[in-house]
Curated annotation (Swiss-Prot):
It comes from Alkaliphilus metalliredigens (strain QYMF). Its cofactor is Mg(2+). GO terms for biological process: division septum assembly. Pfam families: MMR_HSR1. GTP binds at residues 30-37, 57-61, 75-78, 142-145, 174-176. InterPro entries: G_ENGB_dom, GTP-bd, GTP-bd_ribosome_bio_YsxC, P-loop_NTPase, Small_GTP-bd. This is Probable GTP-binding protein EngB. Mg(2+) binds at S37, T59. The keyword Ligase does not apply. The keyword GTP-binding applies. Belongs to the TRAFAC class TrmE-Era-EngA-EngB-Septin-like GTPase superfamily. EngB GTPase family. It comes from the Bacteria. Residues 22-195 form the EngB-type G domain. GO terms for molecular function: GTP binding; metal ion binding.
Length: 208
């Protein structure tokens, strides 16, 4: 996917704050500190568009990024951060449920899992939630450069088995640091654009 323009256009906590253009949306979900901001910057070829923090739990809103003026990439609040009150966790859960259940122009939710660790109970719940609302599913295994390639298949099996992934679910290893797996992820998203006949221009990035 050739990225010509990308900008953050909205941060929202309620439906009345969502963008109203009705453009197609692709959402990214995952635990705090799983690497969502780094992935956004990498796939959009921007260094600091999404703020990367070493402190988990920084994303507390739904952040909408307008891509090529044709669709939105939506960064969902990270879950699983221990130093958050029960009330705040509950409000985040309601925010996510409201968005996932009442957004007709949302076409896919991509779940990010740290390849190094077994998916947590909250990861499993999020996966089931995504399936419940009828999305793909695409699972991205982040930080794939942090383990030896010889260990990848072992960790892929761990992720698939723990989440209970279907054989048709896509599991894509990604390294934002080394820019590995980016084309594969865009390919999976482009398939969704085509399958749903979305008016999104699919133009490949020229080889470097």
């Amino acid at each position: 996917m050739k990225i010509k323009t990308s900008d953050i256009v909205m941060s929202a906590v309620a439906p009345k704050q969502y963008p109203e253009e009705g453009l197609p949306e692709i959402a990214l979900a995952g635990r705090s500190n799983v690497g969502k901001s780094s992935l956004i910057n990498t796939i959009l070829n921007r260094k600091k568009l999404a703020r990367v923090s070493s402190s988990p739990g920084k994303t507390r809103t739904l952040n909408f990024y307008l891509i090529n003026k044709e669709f939105h990439l939506v960064d969902l609040p990270g879950y699983g951060y221990a130093r958050v009150s029960k009330g705040e966790k509950s409000s985040w859960g309601k925010m996510l449920e409201t968005y996932l259940s009442n957004r007709p122009n949302l076409y896919e939710v991509v779940l990010l899992i740290d390849i190094r660790h077994e998916p947590s109970e909250q990861d499993q719940q999020m996966y089931q939630w995504i399936r419940h609302y009828g999305y793909g599913t695409i699972v991205v295994a982040t930080k794939s450069d942090k383990i030896a390639r010889s260990q990848h298949q072992k960790h892929f099996k761990m992720i698939r088995d723990t989440l209970g992934m279907s054989p048709e679910d896509r599991l894509i290893p990604i390294s934002s640091l080394k820019k590995l797996g980016i084309e594969q992820l865009w390919g999976a998203l482009e398939d969704i654009f085509v399958e749903n006949e979305l008016p999104i221009t699919i133009e490949k990035e020229a080889p470097k």
